[in-house]
Amino acid sequence: MPYQRDTLYDTPQAVVDFRFDERTAAVFPDMIHRSVPGYATLLQLFAVIGAGFVPEGGHVYDLGCALGGASIALQRHIPQSATIDAVDNAEAMTRRLAAYVEGAGISNIRVQQADITALDYRPADLIIMAFTLQFIPPEARDALLVRLRQTLRPGGALLLAEKTRPDDDRMRQWHEAFKAAQGYSQMAIAQKRESLENVMQTDRAVTIETRLQQAGFTRIEPCFRALQFCGWVASV
């Protein structure tokens, strides 16, 4: 998928709340790979782990799909008779993903612009949420996880990845050092951090695991960690 280099915060500006708009969509692949350590590995892990939960004719949700990185990786590993509903509330993201899917001739990914907290879910074998829950208001997270648990068929799983809130400041410093090593300036890092303050509210890892347990997931297994970026397989 064509994309530009992320320079959104390279110049001094009056910082506004981060939005998944056209400007973000145009640079998103570069942004997320340079901002999330191990992102490519996470997508590969979710694809190979997730494929084990998807049977012939199975059904998958990719919630908060953005430009469909997880969906595109997964569809190479699952039966062609299985379908993936890639859902995001950002029109700029879904429009680009729909155009890519059509142009690439990928027939088993269906793209939908919708609010995942109000979606009319149908039974699924696998649900993927990669760095999505952190953008849902904290007071709505438990109810959403309960709905997802109820959506999954017996033997199904939720693959969840989140940026977690560390217990001290060292992890933030290490993450910002990682971003600097990817070519982001200190000004860009600071302005991006400020833009996310009112938009992304992270939980501690233990809080996320508690939310999953209380939602009714019976087996919760960590499968990924790079700095404060974590992934879990939550099975039913």
Model-derived features: positions:
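Conserved class I S-adenosyl-L-methionine
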Residues: 57-66
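A short glycine-rich, Lys/Arg-flanked "PGG" loop and its adjoining helix->strand segment in the class I
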Residues: 142-154
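A short acidic, Gly/Pro-enriched loop at the edge of an enzyme's catalytic core
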Residues: 117-127
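Class I SAM-dependent methyltransferase SAM/SAH-binding core
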Residues: 61, 70-117
